[in-house]
Amino acid sequence: MTHHPDELEIWFLTGSQHLYGPEVIDQVAEHAARIVAALDASPHLPVRVVSKPVLTETDSIRRALLDATATDSCVGVIAWMHTFSPAKMWITGLDALRKPLLHLHTQANQALPWAEIDMDFMNLNQAAHGDREFASVQTRMGVARKTVTGHVEDPEVARRIGLWARAALGRHALAGMRLARFGDNMRNVAVTEGDKVEAERRFGVSVNTWGVNDLVAVVDEVADADVDKLCEEYADSYDVAAELLPSGERHESLRYGARIELGLRSFLTEGGFTAFTSNFEDLGGLRQLPGLAVQRLMADGYGFGGEGDWKTSVLLRTLKVVADGLPGGTSFMEDYTYHLVPGEERILGAHMLEVCPSIAEGRPSLEIHPLSIGGREDPVRLVFDAAPGPAVLLGLADLGERFRFVGNEVEVVAPTEPLPNLPVARAVWRPAPDLRTSTEAWLMAGGPHHTVLSTALGAEHLDDLAEMTGTELVLVDADTTIRGLAKELRWSAAYHRLAQGL
């Protein structure tokens, strides 16, 4: 499934004014084009950057930002004040902007030509205070934005702009997302519930429910020839258990798993859905709880949440888009159990079946095992250990009055010992700053037990996404203390309640 359509772009807006004359404006445009070309050539940018005409007056600024807001292909705006652009000209435009904004504080030249500097040079290259003017009005208006300082030849500048651009792509995907719930939430579970109307108002995602037997009807219509072809793909991609091979006694179970995948994929494609949920308590006429099918759809970029958890499904799809093209993987995850030996503390995460193979180390095995819940036939699933490396965990909580992201920086590690009797995919990680602080902080913040684990993303991606969506982010990292977090949560609650009342 395509994550970053070719037509998507970021608009680069350069501010100036008519005071300096047309020759200076032409130079400003030339310098802006060079900066855009450098950004466009950077491997850090996942989407093209498009230079727009230099903006010099209130009406053209307002029109440019209205156009950015109304243009579906524009996922965000980068703004730079090359010369001095009086910021009162930007007020109505900034007030109309509804796309993510990055304020690039840069200049055309990296080194000053000391012996050649005259007042013409000073008038042209005055972003040092032109951007301060621009930032002051943004702060007064409460404009959400990211600020990046430095010359575009500095790889760190392009890297940080690239992080923001990825978050903007995620926000764009979120704003147009359609999610299909097959059945309802797991009975009596609190954390998988949430306000779907507020989610659509806040994020733009449309969450609706279909009967499981609507899916079953599509599954039952899948052609045998298509099942044959998909089973061949399984054999090429995974280490298939002997009993599931064509000569094995349980090959029919694999064929039914393939039938579920083909039917589910068809249903989602036809409906324009990029995320979905299932619930083992509501399987209708399905003979298996979807396992392999869900894992492979996640690997292709779909969002998923178990037990009807649409919030985590939304989050997974969003972060899949943010991470597209980066090394590592991104998966649905659940904290399951702890290793509490002093000095060796770590968390074992898994789920009944549905962990994405994008985080796998090596070639997954395709197996069949009993499942004690759901009351259906034994489901097929991929089994693997997650690849070691730095990662982030992120959950989305509905606090009633607002949504909150809760995140944790972690280190995925190899299992301390082999897990020969655990018939599901799994990940083991050490949370920052330590298990005790991490878990106490997570519980204090009301973080959910379903999360997204990503070895492709870092904390700055999460910061940028939270800023763009106007969502609180509680991030547990190496610097977190329980005392400090308790204060942060109190201050944050006061801030958000006050902000909603204004």
Swiss-Prot record:
Reactions accelerated catalytically: beta-L-arabinopyranose = L-ribulose
Query: Which pathway, per its entry?
Result: Carbohydrate degradation; L-arabinose degradation via L-ribulose; D-xylulose 5-phosphate from L-arabinose (bacterial route): step 1/3
Output the Gene Ontology terms for molecular function.
L-arabinose isomerase activity; manganese ion binding
Instruction: Give me the Gene Ontology terms describing cellular component.
Output: cytosol
User: Looking at the Swiss-Prot or TrEMBL record, what is one Pfam family this protein matches?
Assistant: AraA_N
Q: What does this protein do?
A: Catalyzes the conversion of L-arabinose to L-ribulose.
Q: Kindly give the NCBIfam families that the UniProt entry links to this protein.
A: PRK02929.1
Q: Return the protein name.
A: L-arabinose isomerase
